């Protein structure tokens, strides 16, 4: 079905998107007051904007599981690009404030998802991968804990058992 025209309209505090398809008008409305009540105070920080971090951030945004989503990465242009991609792809999903930033922006996060680390390279042993990713975890955890000490932390990086222990050990 061909898309003829689409218009965003803001009426009475809600966002409306009108699409005209074959002379029928479909309306998609989002009630901003209801959305605020459902997701009030849910701030999620994703450390690492690689494939895993970006996928998790996208899933959180399209499911409407948070009201604010922060992407932090050592490669700042990558984090900014992923945040912009998710914002642009989030037009028909529940509203979520998506942005990139740095550790101080993670203050008052309800959840921190840690996806930092490098992928296993050809010929690299699992022990070498463990050592490299443990060093990365040891550098990241003290910084994020300083700004989000009461957050729930979720480690999604390989090897997850060793890195979870390392996260607990270095965070105090």
Where are these regions (language model features)?
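Aromatic pocket-lining residues of Rossmann-like dinucleotide-binding sites
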Residues: 60
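Rossmann-like NAD(P)(H) cofactor-binding subdomain of soluble oxidoreductases
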Residues: 125-172
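A short, basic/flexible loop-to-alpha-helix module at the beginning of a structural domain
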Residues: 33-42
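Conserved NAD(P)H cofactor-binding loop of Rossmann-fold oxidoreductase domains
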Residues: 116-118
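N-terminal Rossmann-fold NAD(P) dinucleotide-binding loop
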Residues: 53-54
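Conserved N-terminal Rossmann-fold NAD(P) cofactor-binding segment
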Residues: 68, 72-110, 124
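Glycine-rich Rossmann-fold phosphate-binding loop(s) that bind the pyrophosphate
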Residues: 49-50
């Amino acid at each position: 079905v061909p898309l003829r025209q689409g218009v965003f309209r803001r009426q009475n505090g809600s966002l409306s998107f009108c699409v005209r398809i074959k002379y029928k008008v479909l309306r998609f409305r989002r009630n901003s007051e209801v959305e605020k009540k459902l997701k009030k105070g849910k701030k999620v920080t994703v450390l690492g904007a690689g494939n895993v971090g970006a996928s998790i951030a996208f899933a959180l945004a399209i499911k409407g599981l948070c009201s604010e989503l922060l992407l932090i990465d050592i490669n700042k242009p990558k984090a900014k690009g992923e945040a912009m991609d998710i914002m642009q792809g989030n037009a028909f999903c529940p509203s979520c404030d998506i942005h990139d930033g740095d550790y101080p922006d993670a203050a008052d996060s309800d959840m921190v998802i840690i996806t930092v680390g490098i992928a296993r390279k050809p010929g690299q042993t699992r022990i070498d991968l463990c050592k490299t990713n443990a060093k990365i975890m040891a550098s990241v955890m003290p910084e994020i804990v300083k700004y989000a000490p009461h957050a729930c932390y979720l480690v999604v990086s390989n090897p997850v058992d060793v890195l979870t222990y390392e996260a607990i050990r270095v965070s105090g």
